[in-house]
Design a protein with these regions (language model features):
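Internal amphipathic helical hairpin motif
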Residues: 65-99, 157-189
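Conserved, structured C-terminal
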Residues: 1-26, 30-34, 108-371
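Well-ordered mid-protein domain cores that form the structural environment of catalytic cofactors
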Residues: 78-132
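Acidic active-site catalytic centers that drive phospho-/nucleotidyl reactions
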Residues: 53, 102, 205
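Membrane-targeting and insertion segments and their boundary/processing signals
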Residues: 41-45, 96-99, 103, 187-194
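Acidic, proline/glycine-enriched N-terminal capping motif
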Residues: 1-90, 98
């Protein structure tokens, strides 16, 4: 896909003005980093705040009297029990019990659900949703009508509160519970604000009309200027999520992986019926052949696709790897046989034809302190 055919978010001009390096990603031209670099951006989110343009993500609305049960059967987690004004992480699975995508479902109204899907999977997910929901509910793809801005970090709530007015009287954005979602005005624009994110820090995601994104973006940057806010590209977004041990579709999870081996059994509400439930239950009963583990790599930076070695034999593969700026170590996620998945197991990763030492460790690599 050439640059001329790449999609651009409504904030493209803002990124260019800020000096961002723009790269192709999932059919979009997105900022990978800004002039100060990925490590500086990463540390800003851990220590203060960062603002992200996530408008490339997909948004699908499911509405109507049949929406609750339709989405509950579609998603692995308990959606039937999800209260209005709450969100829940879950999986879209196929009948084989492997992962079509990981999503967050927001219950905005009694009969209105918003499913946020990964940018690379919008068309595939939309077809999957339509196939399984059928005529039970109304489905709307709002991906190109919805802008998404995230503010993440320990100072996110202070920054958000200065430019946000909730539609609920006598409430502030700081009152919003984790995985809560509420109607609001952000920088003067109507929005839904959720206390969700992909960094391992406290933070918010703001869903806005596509043509109203620039005002809130500039207001949030201005409001957070004295508090250390920085614009954050996809590069730091990846290092942040990896330290927090969040899965990336196409790396840790895809249609060749099941939730049990991927460490996502907790998202599967096996007491209910959902697409792929029976196949997943069978894997859980017999046990998976492999599991995803966290690694600390001593002699280099492991990358996606690098081989994991034990006793001179290739036993697995790295799904993601980086230097973790917060933890100060080279970290990775990898699939290995169950017998080698125990914390403390000594392995190696083959980097440039050289086997470097690696050790299985507990994840997440970084967990923010409770406040």
């Amino acid at each position: 896909m050439t640059t001329a055919t790449l999609l651009r978010t409504p904030l493209y001009g803002e990124h260019v003005a800020l000096g961002a390096k723009m790269v192709p990603f999932a059919g979009w031209e997105m900022p990978i980093q800004y002039p100060d670099g990925i490590v500086t951006e990463h540390r800003a989110v851990r220590g203060a705040a960062g603002i992200f343009d996530l408008s490339h993500m997909g948004e699908v609305y499911v509405r109507g009297s049949g929406a609750r049960m339709a989405v509950d059967r579609l998603v692995s987690s308990d959606i039937a029990g999800l209260e209005k004004g709450k969100a829940r992480y879950g999986l879209l699975c196929n009948e084989r019990g492997t992962i079509v995508d990981d999503v967050i479902v927001y219950r905005l109204e009694d009969e209105t659900y918003l499913i946020v899907v990964n940018a690379s999977n919008v068309e595939k997910d939309l077809a999957h949703i339509r196939r399984h929901v059928g005529s039970a509910a109304e489905i709307e793809d709002a991906s190109l009508d919805t802008a998404l801005i995230a503010v993440q970090g320990p100072r996110a709530s202070v920054i958000m509160s200065s430019v946000t007015d909730l539609e609920i009287r006598e409430a502030t954005i700081e009152d919003l519970a984790p995985f809560g979602v509420v109607a609001a005005r952000v920088g003067g624009a109507r929005a839904h604000v959720a206390r969700t994110g992909y960094t391992g820090e406290d933070g918010f995601e703001v869903f806005l009309p596509w043509d109203r994104a620039v005002g809130p973006w500039t207001r949030l940057l201005a409001a957070g200027g004295a508090l250390g806010i920085r614009p954050i590209g996809l590069g730091a977004r990846d290092t942040l999520r990896l330290e927090a041990r969040f899965s990336l579709y196409g790396n840790e999870i895809d249609e060749t992986t099941d939730p049990i081996e991927a460490g996502l059994a907790w998202t599967c509400h096996l007491e209910k019926d959902f697409v792929g439930r029976d196949a997943i239950a069978k894997v859980k009963e017999r046990g998976p052949a492999r599991r995803i583990v966290g690694l600390v790599v001593e002699g280099g930076v492991a990358r996606h696709g690098h081989e994991v070695v034990h006793g001179g034999r290739i036993v697995g593969q790295v799904t993601s790897g980086t230097f973790g700026p917060t933890v100060g170590k080279n970290i990775a996620l990898a699939y290995v046989p169950v017998g080698l998945a125990k914390v403390g197991t000594e392995l190696a990763v083959r980097i440039r034809e050289r086997d470097v030492a690696a050790r299985v460790v507990r994840t997440p690599f970084h967990k923010r302190e409770a406040t």
